[in-house]
From Swiss-Prot:
Keywords: Cytoplasm, GTP-binding, Nucleotide-binding, Protein biosynthesis
Function: Increases the formation of ribosomal termination complexes and stimulates activities of RF-1 and RF-2. It binds guanine nucleotides and has strong preference for UGA stop codons. It may interact directly with the ribosome. The stimulation of RF-1 and RF-2 is significantly reduced by GTP and GDP, but not by GMP.
Protein name: Peptide chain release factor 3
Boundaries of every tr-type G domain copy: 9-278
Compartments in which it is found: Cytoplasm
Residues bound to GTP: 18-25, 86-90, 140-143
Organism: Haemophilus influenzae (strain ATCC 51907 / DSM 11121 / KW20 / Rd)
GO CC terms in record: cytosol
Origin superkingdom: Bacteria
Main location: cytoplasm
HAMAP family with a match to the protein in the record: Rel_fac_3
GO biological process, one term: regulation of translational termination
Gene symbol of the encoding locus: prfC
């Protein structure tokens, strides 16, 4: 058989989710260090460049070119090939972040142990729930003063509604941080500060009651560890592979990414427990990752901000089969066959032309405006993958033209940008406003600058009285007509002409939902 299943089975595709400042960039960097993808940590651009605010944002994009190198990184670890998908944090936050989570088989959740569960983490976890994605948890920043570890586990369980199974347990924190104890292996790994940029051998003490442990961490901390572990082992969950795969239980690791400690523990967990590339639901059937014929779907489109190169790169997750350079694929939505000879792969940060890729891998397709989010490519079969959602935006602005004669170009530009997933556009039924919706502020700046460079339309955005939006449907035609008649001032069409309810306040939305129980208000919609 020409299709090597061992290639598929050794792949692990995951994303990191966290609140800004929980240490995601540092972890990404340390993970690449362990995967031998970079030689010394400190080469992933992180906070140092955070001073680039909005004003020099275009310049920043030019420096980054397509910030594609940090979007997907592939590296070997243990006997696996790991694909790490970056989910932009901070101001880059957009629907892309959400959609990236639909293209992975597991996630690493990073929590700042001094702060606990934060708002962005909660939002991202909601998205992983759409597909019950398995979650591994890393409690970061133990080299600082942290909250009580038992309290942290309780918070994850109560707020994120997922059971915790601690795999390692911290000994002290802040200046007194001495290391972690591995519950399953009955070993203590001792921490040495100042080892952040390279990988050093760690001293291991075997056995919890080994007198060597008391010498290494001090009598008080050793005693405290034994007492805490009695409590923890009595009260917490054992790790169960089955519950983990269903997204009901998360293994928890403690460490400090900055001090390069504990990162290898969760990587071992990831390669050992995280699922290999999974099957995926399409409209007509389920596609298994072991199938020989190629199939894949586009989950993200990255625009290049360099006006000289209007290339955009469509990120495609390979679901089944093998991509080979120069192969002919069917672009199902438009029914055309295309030869793909210059797909990109992402080996450890280099943008290289792909010779081959297997299920679980991510490849980049050059897109000159024909590819949309959610598009499926196959080796001839007509099917469409489902589960690539649009999310109800949380921020809204009205877009206004400086030159009113360019209304047509503006609409064309906005619809194309919405197909690409850069922003969502809404046209109210009762006026000629154009309202754009996003989940991150930066998206508005992107839209205005791209309208100018790509469509030659000068536009500005201004505040608009919209708090939230929901897609609406109703099985009862008569009731739906009445709803539409009475709520016309709150209705709009989105970029794909789907009817949307635009609410000025959350109270208004809640009242509408109570008043019209037969109308369904959706927070997400299929692409």
């Amino acid at each position: 058989m020409s299709y090597p299943l061992e290639e598929v089975n050794k792949r692990r595709t995951f994303a990191i989710i966290s609140h800004p400042d929980a240490g995601k960039t540092t972890i990404t960097e340390k993970v690449l260090l362990y995967g031998n993808a970079i030689q010394t940590a400190g080469s992933v651009k992180g906070k140092g460049s955070a001073a680039h605010a909005k004003s020099d944002w275009m310049e920043m994009e030019k420096q980054r070119g397509i910030s594609i190198t940090t979007s997907v990184m592939q590296f070997p670890y243990n006997d696996c090939l790991v694909n790490l998908l970056d989910t932009p944090g901070h101001e880059d936050f957009s629907e892309d972040t959400y959609r990236t989570l639909t293209a992975v088989d597991s996630c690493l959740m990073v929590i700042d142990s001094a702060k606990g569960v934060e708002e962005r983490t909660i939002k991202l976890m909601e998205v992983t729930r759409l597909r019950d994605t398995p979650i591994i948890t890393f409690m970061n920043k133990l080299d600082r003063d942290i909250r009580d570890p038992i309290e942290l586990l309780d918070e994850v369980e109560n707020v994120l509604k997922i059971r915790c199974a601690p795999i390692t347990w911290p000994i002290g924190c802040g200046k007194l941080f001495k290391g972690v104890y591995h519950l399953a292996k009955d070993e203590t790994y001792l921490y040495q500060s100042g080892q952040g940029s390279t990988i050093q051998a760690v001293r291991v003490v075997k056995g919890l009651n080994n007198p060597e442990l008391d010498v290494a961490v001090g009598d008080d901390l050793a005693q405290q560890l034994r007492e805490e572990l009695e409590l923890v082992q009595g009260a917490s969950n054992e790790f169960e592979q089955d519950a983990f795969i269903k997204g009901e239980l998360t293994p928890v690791f403690f460490g400090t990414a900055l001090g390069n400690f504990g990162v290898d523990h969760f990587l071992d967990g990831l390669t050992q427990w995280a699922p290999k590339p999974q099957s995926r639901q399409a409209d007509t059937r389920t596609v298994e990752s072991a199938e020989e014929k190629f199939s894949g779907f586009v989950f993200k489109i990255q625009a290049n901000m360099d006006p000289k190169h209007r290339d955009r790169v469509a990120f495609m997750r390979v679901v089944s089969g093998k991509y080979e350079k120069g192969m002919k694929l069917k672009h199902v939505r438009i029914g055309k066959d295309v030869v793909i000879s210059d797909a990109l792969t992402f080996m450890a940060g280099d943008r290289a032309h792909a010779e081959e890729a297997y299920a679980g891998d991510i490849i980049g397709l050059h897109n000159h405006g024909t590819i949309q989010i959610g598009d499926t490519f196959t080796q001839g079969e007509t099917l469409k993958f489902t589960g690539i959602p649009n999310f109800a935006p949380e921020l809204f602005r009205r877009i206004r033209l400086k030159d009113p004669l360019k209304q047509k170009q503006l609409l064309k530009g906005l619809v194309q940008l919405s197909e690409e997933g850069a922003v969502q556009v809404f046209r109210p039924l009762l006026n000629n406003d154009l309202i754009v919706g996003a989940v991150g502020v930066l998206q508005f700046d992107v839209v205005v600058s791209r309208l100018k460079t790509e469509y030659n339309v000068e536009a500005i955005y201004e505040n608009v009285n919209v708090a939230t939006a929901r897609w609406v449907e109703c099985a009862d035609e008569k009731k739906f007509e009445e709803f539409k008649r009475k709520n016309e001032q709150n209705l709009a069409l989105d970029g794909g002409d789907n009817l949307t309810y635009i609410a000025p306040t959350m109270v208004n939305l809640n009242l509408a939902q109570e008043r019209y129980p037969d109308v369904v208000f959706y927070k997400t919609r299929e692409h």
